[in-house]
């Protein structure tokens, strides 16, 4: 349904539904299967399993933050084409959310207990970015996706050699994050200041340190 055909109440209800789906585990259907070459679950030691679960919890939290960011930006973006771009990217990343949840379940673990907090903070940041300007909003997305790609590549390097399953999931996510970055830049995203990029990285590091354990 086109954005312009929705009433304010409809848009609010749709936003609440999207928020709940982002923070409630296993509430989203995946439109694509896990991007893995085998259904075999790799054997991991207890220590390895805990470490991989910590990494996947970080990645799941990152996807929750991405949902909040995109939803917030779509809520305040001034241009309907930008709103549509934000919503399309958010919908594509729902699969990432589901893939991380699935792998966490396979590892006998769970998402971060602070998931609602991460979503709320990200929604607020996205809404502010969207209200400033389309160029800033899209630049914020581009920088976010670049930093997400960095930590995905770092996590791939930390995985146990036998955990090809997690590696393939993260590799597919990384490829799509970079595509979303290029899409944001192609739609007019502006480069952020060094201070802004540093602040975003600092906040992301705090999130990762917390989500790994909780």
From Swiss-Prot:
User: Which EC number(s) are documented for this chain?
Assistant: 1.14.99.60
Q: Top-level EC class, please? A: oxidoreductase
Question: Can you list the disulfide-bonded cysteine pairs?
Answer: none
Alphabetized InterPro entries for the sequence = COQ7_proteobact (IPR047809), Ferritin-like (IPR012347), Ferritin-like_SF (IPR009078), Ubq_synth_Coq7 (IPR011566)
An example GO BP is: ubiquinone biosynthetic process
A Gene Ontology MF term for this entry? metal ion binding
TM region(s), chain numbering? none
> At which positions is Fe cation 2 bound?
93, 145, 177, 180
Which reactions appear under catalytic activity for this entry?
a 5-methoxy-2-methyl-3-(all-trans-polyprenyl)benzene-1,4-diol + AH2 + O2 = a 3-demethylubiquinol + A + H2O
Q: How does it sit in the membrane?
A: Peripheral membrane protein
Where is this protein localized, as stated in its record? Cell membrane
Which Gene3D superfamilies is this protein grouped with? 1.20.1260.10
Q: What does this protein do?
A: Catalyzes the hydroxylation of 2-nonaprenyl-3-methyl-6-methoxy-1,4-benzoquinol during ubiquinone biosynthesis.
PANTHER family reported for this sequence? 5-DEMETHOXYUBIQUINONE HYDROXYLASE, MITOCHONDRIAL, COENZYME Q10 BIOSYNTHESIS PROTEIN 7
Q: Which family does this protein fall into? A: Belongs to the COQ7 family.
Show the NCBIfam families listed in the entry: DMQ_monoox_COQ7
Q: Know the name of this protein?
A: 3-demethoxyubiquinol 3-hydroxylase
Q: Which organism is it from?
A: Psychrobacter cryohalolentis (strain ATCC BAA-1226 / DSM 17306 / VKM B-2378 / K5)
């Amino acid at each position: 349904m086109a954005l312009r055909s929705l009433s304010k109440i409809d848009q609010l209800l749709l936003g609440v539904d999207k928020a709940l789906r982002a923070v409630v585990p296993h509430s989203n259907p995946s439109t694509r299967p896990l991007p893995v070459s085998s259904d075999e679950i790799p054997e991991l030691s207890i220590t390895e399993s805990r470490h991989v679960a910590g990494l996947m919890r970080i990645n799941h939290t990152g996807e929750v933050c991405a949902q909040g960011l995109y939803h917030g930006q779509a809520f305040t973006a001034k241009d309907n084409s930008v709103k549509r771009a934000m919503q399309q990217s958010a919908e594509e990343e729902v699969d990432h959310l589901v893939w991380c949840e699935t792998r966490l379940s396979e590892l006998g673990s769970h998402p971060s207990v602070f998931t609602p907090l991460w979503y709320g903070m990200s929604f607020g940041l996205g809404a502010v970015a969207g209200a400033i300007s389309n160029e800033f909003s899209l630049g914020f997305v581009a920088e976010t996706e670049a930093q997400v790609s960095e930590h995905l590549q770092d996590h791939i390097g930390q995985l146990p050699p036998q955990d090809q399953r997690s590696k393939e999931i993260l590799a597919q996510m990384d490829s799509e994050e970079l595509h979303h970055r290029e899409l944001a830049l192609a739609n007019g995203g502006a480069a952020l200041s060094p201070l802004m990029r540093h602040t975003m990285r600092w906040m992301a590091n705090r999130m990762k340190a917390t989500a790994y354990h909780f």
